[in-house]
């Protein structure tokens, strides 16, 4: 995965306690994404900071976590993350997605 301050894309991921699925989703995105990403926002609606262990190590300095206590629900979690986005484009995914080939953002 390529991170760039010049990128016009932010990755937003919503999650709720399914850390095994989230880890797989992020690993597959890391393996196949070909578009530079400015930053990553992950909303975790379970209130569990264990979410921070799910990201690939090289994402750490580019990732912001929103761990909701109390729970906000999916739509408010999305609104929270989007309120911090500074890029014109958002690539949004959920904790149970799988990426299997390059070009997913470019083709979106």
Where would I find each of the regions flagged by the language model?
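Short beta-strand-to-loop acidic/aromatic patch adjacent to the donor-nucleotide binding site
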Residues: 88-98
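N-proximal low-complexity "stem/linker" segments adjacent to membrane-targeting elements
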Residues: 1-27
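Acidic donor-binding/catalytic loop of UDP-sugar-dependent glycosyltransferases
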Residues: 97-107
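Conserved donor nucleotide-binding strand/loop of the catalytic core
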Residues: 59-72
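A conserved acidic beta->alpha catalytic loop
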Residues: 42-53
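Short, acidic, metal-binding catalytic loop of nucleotide-sugar glycosyltransferases
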Residues: 27-37
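A short, glycine-/small-residue-rich helix N-cap motif at loop->alpha-helix starts
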Residues: 69-76, 82, 100
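Active-site nucleotide-sugar/metal-binding loop of Leloir-type enzymes
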Residues: 79-89
């Amino acid at each position: 995965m390529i991170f760039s301050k010049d990128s016009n894309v932010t990755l937003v991921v919503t999650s709720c306690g399914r850390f095994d699925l989230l880890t797989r989703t992020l690993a597959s995105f890391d393996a196949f994404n070909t578009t530079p990403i400015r930053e990553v926002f992950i909303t975790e609606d379970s209130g569990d900071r264990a979410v921070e262990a799910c990201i690939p190590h090289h994402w750490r300095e580019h990732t912001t976590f929103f761990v909701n206590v109390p729970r906000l629900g999916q739509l408010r979690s999305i609104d929270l993350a989007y309120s911090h986005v500074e890029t014109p484009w958002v690539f949004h995914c959920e904790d149970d997605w799988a990426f299997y080939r390059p070009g997913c953002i470019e083709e979106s």
